[in-house]
Each structure stands twice: as structure tokens, then as C-alpha cells.
């Protein structure tokens, strides 16, 4: 069975955006964004994903990847 992997670090690097800057734009704490970035979460709210995509000007598929 595969798994969904978060690639937030890659998208942030492409956009040259720091965790602090993204945190301020999204309205999520640095700690929670860090957990998202490192994949130490089991779920993410659509509203949070939407806010991240808005801040990074990307699509959910740019952040989420299905790996077999």
C-alpha cells in the first residue's frame, strides 16, 4: 500500500519562502507548519491546505504526492 507524502519543503524552497513568512500568511503556528512540513501529521484540514496553496500560489498536487 502506498502513502501520501507532503512536499511542502520543496514548494517553499521554490518560492523562497521561510516557515515564519508562510506561518504569518496562512495563520497557522510555526510549530504546526513545521509538523506539516516534516510530515509528522496524519491529517490536514482542507482549509489549511487551501490557505497554504493560496500563500504559495500552487495547487494541492504540488504539495501532496502519492508514493507506492
Give residue ranges: language-model regions.
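A short, Lys/Arg-rich alpha-helix, primarily the initiator
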Residues: 1-17
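Residues within the helices of the helix-turn-helix
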Residues: 9, 20, 50
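The alpha-helix within a helix-turn-helix
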Residues: 12, 23, 53
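DNA major-groove recognition helix of helix-turn-helix
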Residues: 37, 67
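DNA major-groove recognition helix of helix-turn-helix/homeodomain DNA-binding modules
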Residues: 47-62
